[in-house]
Amino acid sequence: MRREYKVRVWRCIAFVGLFLCFLLGLGVGAYAQNANDILGKAAAAYENSNGISASFTMFTRSAGQNAGESFEGTIQMKGDKFTLVTPEALTWFNGTTQWTYVERNDEVNVTNPTGEELQFTNPALLFNSYKKGFTAAYKGESTAPNGKAAYDVELTPKKKGDIVKVELQIEKYSNFPARITVTSKNGVSSTIQISQLKTGINQPDRFFVFNEGDYPDVEVIDLR
């Protein structure tokens, strides 16, 4: 897989991990308007969703750039599993193994994410990372790109690292994220803006596994 593909796909997968982190890892709070309670209600909304499907646009911009790059994609999630579709790649993750297919190269890379990668794909590790490594702050209310009222929550790391801050915009009444922005120390700002989200999309577990029968001529590169 070419390096630029890896970077773009990895950014998407990282956002998926962050999404799963905040929706799976956090406990349900009371109904006061503070950061942890807002995140708690978002967790409850996801746990009760019975699977979700979402369309999104991802924007990436480097410091000093007047214009960045963007692309659209879709994602389906159930528990810690997801299937991600972007213009350049398809990714399946069944909670343990990840398959990334790049059509231009006609190849599939198979990995079992470990270490730093698991911090983005394993909800339990993400939960521990959030609880131990970030401080959540309620920043007020705003209007989401879809016109709905939303809460703004900002996460800042307790220790210096690659991430400077994570900004979450969570719809006030549905409790689902409308926008997630991650700012890195290298000046890159990446935003996923969710345009459509449906609940009750309870796909079977096999939906989150790469099926070689659907891609008979593809080259499978097992990196496990």
Where are these regions (language model features)?
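An acidic-aromatic
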Residues: 72-120, 190-191
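N-terminal leader/targeting segments and the immediate start of mature chains
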Residues: 25-67, 78-81, 219-224
